[in-house]
Amino acid sequence: MLTWALTFFVLGVIAAVFGFGGVIGVAASIAKVIFLLCVAFVVLFSVLAFKQHKRHK
């Protein structure tokens, strides 16, 4: 999933140079969604790992 996020990020940067038009603008939107999902998963799993670590002490 992170590979796709990086791919769409690169396409999004290229789109920014050319003004976010057409299909590339859609790629930038997809990159934002994938990035936010990855951040949400990192936060979720960090909280779960912290709780599990605290429980086993």
Curated annotation (Swiss-Prot):
What is its subcellular localisation? Cell membrane
Q: Between which residues do disulfide bridges form?
A: none
InterPro entries, alphabetically?
DUF1328
Determine if Transmembrane helix is one of this entry's keywords: yes
Coarsely, its chief localization is membrane
What kind of membrane protein is this, topologically? Answer: Multi-pass membrane protein
Keywords recorded for this protein, A-Z: Cell membrane, Membrane, Transmembrane, Transmembrane helix
The membrane-spanning stretches of this chain are 8-28, 30-50
Pfam families (UniProt xref):
DUF1328
Where does the source fall among the domains of life? Bacteria
> Transmembrane helix: is it a keyword of this entry?
yes
Recorded GO cellular component terms are: plasma membrane
Q: Which family does it belong to?
A: Belongs to the UPF0391 family.
Protein name in the entry: UPF0391 membrane protein Patl_0263
Organism this protein belongs to: Pseudoalteromonas atlantica (strain T6c / ATCC BAA-1087)
